[in-house]
Structure formats: C-alpha cells, structure tokens
C-alpha cells in the first residue's frame, strides 16, 4: 500500500461577503460555499487521500468551524486555525481545542501595514514562542516583498516548525516586465531556507500570476522556475504540495494545479523525494498520525 498523499493547503467556507472582504471584484467564483463534499472528488481524482484545512479569515469562530468539519470528516487530517496570539490568556484559549485535529495557526500577515512591527511585537512573539513550546506549527503568509520583514522573526522562533505558505508569494505577474523580480524573490527565499526549521508549501503560485487575463505559457514557465528555485533552496525534504483550493480556481482547476506539480516532480525528484512532497513532509511537520488505511 502506498503512502498517504496529502494536500497540505486548502480552505473551506460558508460564504458571507462581510466575512470575506478579500473576495473582491472579479472573484465571483469564490463567492459561494466551499465545503468538503466539493473538494473530495477532486482529491480522489488526483489520488490524494487527506488534506490540511487552513483558516481563510481571522476569528476564533473560523477555527471552531474548521474543527467541526474535521471532526465529521476523516479526510481532513489537520486544521491550521486562527487565534489572537497576543492574548494574555492564550494557553487557556487554545486548551479549549485540546484533543482535536488542530495542529497549527496562521494570521494574514500579508495584510498588515507593517509586517516587521507586527511580528516584532512582544506579545505576539510571546504567543508564537508558546505555540512552538507546545508543538504547534505557525504558517507564515507574506508577499515576496515582505520576506525580509519576517527573516529575523523566523530565525528567532526556531523551537518548532515554521511553514512558509505559497513559497513566499513570488511576484509572478511582474516576471515578464521586471528582470529582477525572480532573482529578488529567490535571494529572499534562500535566506529563509537557510533556517532548517522552515519548510515551504508549493501552493498558491497560479494566482500570483496575472490570473485576470488567464494563465499563459509564459506563466507556466515562470511557475516551473519558482518550483525549481524552491527545490534548490529547501531541498526535497522540506517541500510540500498544497492546492490552495478553492482560491486556485481564480486561475486554474484543481486538476490543473495538481497535474502541474506532478509533471514537475516526475522530472525532478526521485520516488522517495516525491513521497515527501506529496505527504511525507506534511505528515512530519504537522504531526499527523499514521493512517490505519491509506485508501481513498
């Protein structure tokens, strides 16, 4: 029986415009409910047997919602939720979810006006230190231009895994008109990859291209360049596949996203390295239990 293949990054929501202000003009495909019954046939078609559900908005009710879904659905292997890490009663708040599939936390750092000041805040730093001391993962969500702002933060918090979402969001939409964009992102990525406790999700790249005009052949080449750069920086044992469904639907179908990474991996990685990319690294970092049966 083969190892369980895992989609390390996807979202669920019951859509209300007030809850998801980031779903704006031109994003109508996202302005509807997305729940497990819609995802799991797509996963099955790609031989993916489990997923990690990641928060898509701030609020403790978001965490509770995802954990409720995970309780009823075996294929949701883990939840990356949201919590106010600056709260003085953080330990008590997180204790409410003990015994669940909660494995980590995330905040949309990319939306903060001053990312460096946010992560340098003493209360936030105390919260992240507590998470790591208690074996919770922290997912880091920033744009390429913000990577230098989290370098020192990531270096300081080295007691447990940090996961860089979407490969640090390279500015793919700029690659054709800015010869420095790829090199700038790659240099910042290598700085983070030098920290052995930082791992990287190969996720969310299709929507960093100019998805409003549709993906072009040049976009696919640039995405492959980014995949190569991430492999060069992190090595094959610190990469994990994530679909970023349903956000990926702005640019490509679930099958297209998974197939793009599959083709790339087949041409670059050994069988053991592909096993790490497609589940082994996610299982290790998020401390997922060994499945009794990896059947879909």
Swiss-Prot record:
InterPro entries: Amidohydro-rel, Metal_Hydrolase, Metallo-dep_Lactonases. Does not require a divalent metal for activity. The purified enzyme contains Zn(2+), but the addition of chelators does not diminish the catalytic activity of the enzyme, indicating that it does not require a divalent cation for substrate turnover. Pathway: Carbohydrate degradation; L-fucose degradation. Its EC number is 3.1.1.120. Keywords: Carbohydrate metabolism, Fucose metabolism, Hydrolase. It comes from the Bacteria. GO terms for biological process: fucose catabolic process. It holds the Pfam family Amidohydro_2. It catalyses: L-fucono-1,5-lactone + H2O = L-fuconate + H(+); L-fucono-1,4-lactone + H2O = L-fuconate + H(+); D-arabinono-1,4-lactone + H2O = D-arabinonate + H(+); L-xylono-1,4-lactone + H2O = L-xylonate + H(+). Monomer. L-fucono-1,5-lactonase involved in an L-fucose degradation pathway. Catalyzes the hydrolysis of L-fucono-1,5-lactone to L-fuconate. L-fucono-1,5-lactone is the best substrate, but the enzyme can also hydrolyze L-fucono-1,4-lactone, L-galactono-1,4-lactone D-arabinono-1,4-lactone and L-xylono-1,4-lactone. Belongs to the metallo-dependent hydrolases superfamily. It was not possible to determine the kinetic constants for the hydrolysis of L-fucono-1,5-lactone because of chemical instability, and thus, a stable mimic (4-deoxy-L-fucono-1,5-lactone) was utilized. This is L-fucono-1,5-lactonase. It comes from Burkholderia multivorans (strain ATCC 17616 / 249).
